[in-house]
Amino acid sequence: MACTMFTATFSASQEITRTFDIIWAIEAGLWNLRVAAKKFFEENPNADKKTAKEFLVKGLNVYGLNAKRIANELTWEYEEQYVAELLLTYGIGIFDSWVDGIVDTVLIHSSNNLKKKIKEDLKKGEFQTFESALSQEPLSALAGCFHVSPKRQNQHIDNLRLVYKYFKSCRNCCAHGNHQFTAICEANYNAIKTLTKEDCGINEFPKMVETKAGDPVKLILRGVVVFFDVLILKTILHLEILIADHNGALIISIL
């Protein structure tokens, strides 16, 4: 069991690292394309899309590239927002997959229907149903390490949970809504707008815009990047599970 849980947590951390490897490449490539396209059209204002593509992108069959739009019509803020949405959506997906693996592994005696409910709650940033089900599991050294009792409660975890809820609600507006902040987003923002990095135990607090229901969703890429630290911390906080069966120094060195 411990090996399976370790694998789930390690995989999530590795996936986050791989995501950044690609996201930074996309960000840098988009910026370089934008700069090169601006220069090209300044020197060749009447060039068509095919000519621009052949000049700007060599050795790659990219169909439908509208370099003029990248250079002159779309703002860098728009393009960066788009990358931020991709990063946020993928990051939430990593955490959701981790939740599925952990719940299925730890809650051996819970029904499938209960597990489904617990997964839904955890993915919303709500831990109560998980804690309740965990308390019903037969006691073991492993379960004892995992249970977040008042004595073992990390002082930052509730604030981290609230930050997660805010960004999850923003992601929902992008993935399932009309790209407008909802009342839920506004409420989640108000719950964390005065928090600091010290309140959350992180090196930097995620940057956010003032969030009001009905306003267009706006994400700050740097804020989404820092949010990934929250995802990682939320994962690492649960590594207490593994201490009974794995060397803690090994786990820390891997992460």
Predicted regions and their residues:
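Extended intrinsically disordered or low-complexity regions, especially N/C-terminal cytosolic tails and loops
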Residues: M1-K116, P150-L162, E186-L255
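Histidine-centered, metal-coordinating catalytic motifs and their short helical/loop contexts
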Residues: L160-Y189
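Internal hydrophobic scaffold segments of catalytic domains
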Residues: N112-K119, R171-C174
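A contiguous pocket-lining binding segment that forms or flanks enzyme active sites
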Residues: K119-S169
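Generic recognition of cysteine residues
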Residues: C3, C145, C170-C174, C185, ...
